[in-house]
Amino acid sequence: MANFFKDNKDLCFTLNNIDLEEVVRLREENYEFAKEFDNAPADFADALDNYNRVLSVVGEISGDRIEPRSRTVDAEGPHFADGVVTYHPLTVQNLKDLTDAGVMGVMLDHKFGGLNFPVTVYTMMTEMVSRADASLQNIFGLQDIAETINFFGNDEQKEKYLPGFARGELDGAMDLTEPDYGSDLQSVRLRAWQDENGQWYLNGMKRFITNGCAKVHLVLARSEEGTTDGRGLSMFICEACPQLVVRRIEDKLGIHGVATTELQYNDVPAQLCGRRRMGLIRYVMSLMNGARVAISAQAVGIAEAAYREARKYASERKQFKQTIDQFPAIYSMLSEMKVKLTAARALLYETTRAVDLRNGYNALVEQGKATAEDKAKAKYYDKVAAVLTPMCKALATEVSNQIAYDAIQIHGGTGYMRDFNVERFYRDARITNIYEGTTQLQVVAAIGGVMQRANDARIDEMAALPFEGRMAELRDKLLAMRTRQQEIVQFVTDKKDVAFHDLVARNLVEMETYIFVGFLLLRDSLKSEERFAIAERYILDNELEYNKRFDRIMAADVKLIDNKRDIIDY
């Protein structure tokens, strides 16, 4: 029997070594919930044992049931006729298996029938499901919709929807993109209007809506007449109904198991969720940041699957009387794939930990229970999560695409054929650095935190760990890179040139990532010596890359800004 948790040494290491004690204490309100709910942990050891147990269950479902069904789901997919989407029977069975395991309300409060697990543990589930079938994650992961209602909805909305999500009776969709407005969400035009009784209705179109056949939708709509920017947008809850028409499902390159739909709203009854005018500014940005973490996990899951297929094939395929993994050209590729995969996972769960701490301390603030220290931590983790989330999505999704690409290369011609899984991983990975914000938009989201040095406190904390010998030498290399990073940030700031700033932004974000992830991997090597080779390879490779980019920015070459049309239009 395959178990995608127990067979993943790195994932098990992460759960048992990442510091979640503070996270769980906040999540369980100092374990007071144990007095009221039977499934609430009594202490941290109890919580960790519970996380291990549930992750093992999801790992077994993912490895033993979902993955063997994935080829058929990919080949046949959902069907669409007369405005009705019908999911493949195996997709329906996958969702039933997860529902029966009680993991459809992973992060929801105990009082709504949820598990009240941290984002970090839930993300481990989404990684495993994605490794088994990336398209299923696009349905399973939309339980984030329930979490958004929990954060911003009123008590009546919570009572109406959240228990149904926890029981697996309801599924969700987030309806943001329109035919003319994708990244430019502040310009969406779908109209929300009220009748004389105060009832809201929605009119317009949405496109590229994942699981648009869902029972519950969160919709970004323009509630304020005469507005054209983000301040005129509100968030609404609506339900599947005859007035909400699925016009078609898209014919996609990958993630075939989930329906991506075009929706038409014909006076769809809706409820305002939260406050008017805050739809994009607060609620949808929160929803999208949660989705960006989920897509990062999806990317890591695909990368894990692709790496394993490549490693297995290379260890079995013989050429010139030896297996091809004995050739430097191949084992160097496999090594690079493994280093990048481990790096992406390390950043993913450092990010989710920051998100968990942000959520925990902000909850104290909202409940009026926060001390001055708690309020300071809430502000700190707001800043950290805001920069790590886009950094993480950029890294994980680009790594996933590269690993899927290399997995086909290692397979050679056979990898190009549908007989092998790697061609599906390549197709599925391709969307990850596009939806929920392209890599280019993740750079826009992250660059402010990089310029403001939001990661410096955490870097200082890791740099102070008791490294010795070769580890201390690598730490010093990272610190030297951090000093240069501070120098280059000041250089770009002092130029006061917006075009130059935007031109070098991706380099700056990726340079920051090299440093931060290098420290994460070095930190983990203190807990497991066998991880040291990965940390060393990552730091040495990226030291060279860092210096190359540093020199390029310091050269202040603006020729591309001046002659871009000459090149593009040639």
Give the residues covered by each predicted segment.
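Extended, charge-enriched "interface" segments that sit outside catalytic cores
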Residues: 1-81, 85
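Alpha-helix capping/hinge segments and adjacent helical runs
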Residues: 2-5, 10, 17-21, 255, ...
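C-terminal amphipathic alpha-helical interaction region
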Residues: 453, 465-570
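A short core secondary-structure module
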Residues: 199, 203-244
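A glycine-rich, basic-preceded beta-loop-alpha segment at the flavin cofactor/substrate interface
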Residues: 241-242, 247, 252, 259-291, ...
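N-terminal leader/propeptide and maturation segments of large enzyme subunits in energy/redox metabolism
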Residues: 21-60, 149-154, 331, 335-348, ...
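Internal helix-loop-helix
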Residues: 59-60, 90-159, 163, 167, ...
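C-terminal helix-coil-helix/basic helical segment that borders enzyme active sites and/or dimer interfaces
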Residues: 342-393, 489-503, 522-526
